[in-house]
UniProtKB/Swiss-Prot annotation:
Temperature dependence: Optimum temperature is 30-45 degrees Celsius.
EC annotation from Swiss-Prot or TrEMBL: 3.1.1.4
Protein location: Secreted
GO BP of this protein: lipid catabolic process
Tissue specificity as recorded in UniProt: Expressed by the venom gland.
Family: Belongs to the phospholipase A2 family. Group II subfamily.
The protein's name: Phospholipase A2 crotoxin basic chain
Summary of pH dependence: Optimum pH is 8.0.
Cofactor-binding details, from the entry: Binds 1 Ca(2+) ion.
Amino acid sequence: SLVQFEKMIKEVAGKNGVPWY
């Protein structure tokens, strides 16, 4: 789903130190 996709992006971005909000 779109929610899971956004959550995945935020988790990956968080590991890279990039804020996705």
